[in-house]
Amino acid sequence: MIQHEEIATPIGLTARLLDVAEVFAGVGVSREETVVRPGERLPVIGVRDLQDGAVAPREALDTVGFSSLSKAMTYAVQADDVLVTGRGTLLKFGLVGDETAGAIASANIIVVRPGTDVTGGALFAILSSDVFRPKIEVLRRGATTLLSLSPKDLAKLEINLPPLNEQQRIAALVKDAQIAYRTALEAAEIRRSLARRLIDARLFGDNQNH
């Protein structure tokens, strides 16, 4: 239940994350269960599925069997959700797109679901920023390099939220930046593959397949 204890400012409002978003951890599943667990198989998001601010699409995710579909769907992510790694060596963030919506968040993932008059793109920009990231880092606990983050601790952090129209501009910039980044990566991969073929042709000629 999202509460509303906000402090209005000329540039927006200051509020705890729990006042403007729903914050919860995903469902517990082990790697072994991705193979042997019975029930209807659903795509599950793990730590490795968060890369460069994006979340892997449903078809690229491991699937896990769930005996109770209704229970599993309470952990399904929605477009515009912000995902944060709750356990792992690295603190990672991801913004859920339509291609991932409906997948199930694992227990290693914290879901931050924006409330009314809040955009996920703006929340993602705030939480993953170089300014705010250290505030989350200090909340992570662990005796080794495998650190954990509590959803309750994360939810208590205060954020400065811009007005909605500015949030929408920020969200658009985030989306454009992610599209540009993915496009650049795809183009680089194509160039590398082409260069490899040309190099192999010069080195081995027609003998490269023999």
Residue ranges and their predicted role:
Residues 1-33, 39, 161-210:
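Non-catalytic DNA-recognition/assembly elements of restriction-modification systems
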Residues 18-33, 49-79:
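Sequence-specific dsDNA recognition surfaces
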Residues 34-42, 60-63, 75-77, 95-107:
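Short, surface-exposed loop/turn microsegments at beta-strand edges and helix-strand junctions
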Residues 71-72, 99, 144:
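A structural connector/turn signal
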Residues 81-84:
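Generic structural signal for buried aliphatic residues
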Residues 86-127:
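A short beta-sheet element
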Residues 103-108, 141-168:
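A short glycine-rich beta-alpha junction/loop motif
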Residues 120-144:
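Glycine- and charge-enriched low-complexity intrinsically disordered segments
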